[in-house]
Amino acid sequence: MKIKMRGQDVKVFYGSKEALHGITLDIPEHQVTALIGPSGCGKSTFLRCFNRMNDTIEGAKITGLITLDGENIYESRIDVVELRARVGMVFQKPSPFPKSIFENVAYGPRIHGLVKSRAELHDVVEKSLRQAGLFEEVKDRLHEAGTSLSGGQQQRLCIARAIAVSPEVILMDEPCSALDPIATARIEELIDALRKDYTIVIVTHSMQQAARVSQYTAMFHLGHLVEVGETEVMFTSPKEQRTQDYITGRFG
C-alpha cells in the first residue's frame, strides 16, 4: 500500500514545553486514518503538522521529518499556500466564509488560478457540492449566505470548500463534535465515499466514530504514540494496555 504522508520522529515544542515526543506514523493513501486519545494527548497538534498549521502559533517549533509523496513539507522552498491546497483542512466548528454558498466554494479555485472561465468555475462548484452531498439541498439558493445553512450543512459546505481546490489529503479535526447525530451520520457516510478520491486523516474523541469510518487508527497519550494498526484489530485486540483501557472507557 502506498504511503501518502509520513511523520518521522516528529517533536513539537510550544516554547520550552515539548507537546509531542518523537512521533513516527505513516498515512496510507486512499484510506481513513483516525487519531484517537484523551483530551490534550497531542492528536490535534500532530494533525496540524501535516499542513503546517502550527506555523501560525507563536513560539511553536517542529523537529523531525514530515513528507508528502516523499517530499519534506518543511523545506524552505515549499510554498505553504500551495501545500494547504494539497492538504486541506476541515475544522471542529463549521466555519463558512461570510459569503454566499457559491462564493464559499468558488473562492479557493479562483485565488489558486485553477479555473479559466466562469463556466468552468460553475462546474467546479457544482462538482464539489455534489461530492460533499450538499448540491441538491442548496442548488436553488446558491446566492444565499453560507451562514444561513444548518450546522451539518455548513460543515458539508466546508468540506466542499476544501475539495474544490483538488487536494490530495483532507485533514479533519473533530468535524462532528458540534453536530447532532443525524448530521454526524451524514458526515460519516461522506467520509467513506470521499476516500476513493482522497486520503483522509481524522481526529475524533468518539471511539465509535473511529471504528465506523477508519481503516487505520493511531492511539495517542500524553504526547506519545501508544500504538497504531488496522482499526478492526486495534478495537478487538489492542497490543497496549493503555489502548485497551481507553477504548473500554477506563480513562479519557
From Swiss-Prot:
Subcellular location: Cell inner membrane
One cellular-component annotation, GO: plasma membrane
Its membrane topology: Peripheral membrane protein
S-S pairs: none
Its EC number(s): 7.3.2.1
Record-listed ATP binding positions: 37-44
The reaction(s) this protein catalyses: phosphate(out) + ATP + H2O = ADP + 2 phosphate(in) + H(+)
Residue ranges annotated for the ABC transporter domain, each copy included: 5-247
Molecular function in Gene Ontology: ATP binding; ATP hydrolysis activity; ATPase-coupled phosphate ion transmembrane transporter activity
UniProt cross-references to InterPro entries, sorted A to Z: AAA+_ATPase, ABC_transporter-like_ATP-bd, ABC_transporter-like_CS, P-loop_NTPase, PstB-like
Keyword tags: ATP-binding, Cell inner membrane, Cell membrane, Membrane, Nucleotide-binding, Phosphate transport, Translocase, Transport
GO biological process: phosphate ion transmembrane transport
Subunit structure: The complex is composed of two ATP-binding proteins (PstB), two transmembrane proteins (PstC and PstA) and a solute-binding protein (PstS).
UniProt function note: Part of the ABC transporter complex PstSACB involved in phosphate import. Responsible for energy coupling to the transport system.
Family, similarity comment: Belongs to the ABC transporter superfamily. Phosphate importer (TC 3.A.1.7) family.
NCBIfam families to which the protein is assigned, alphabetical: 3a0107s01c2 (TIGR00972)
Protein name: Phosphate import ATP-binding protein PstB
Taxonomic source organism: Bartonella henselae (strain ATCC 49882 / DSM 28221 / CCUG 30454 / Houston 1) (Rochalimaea henselae)
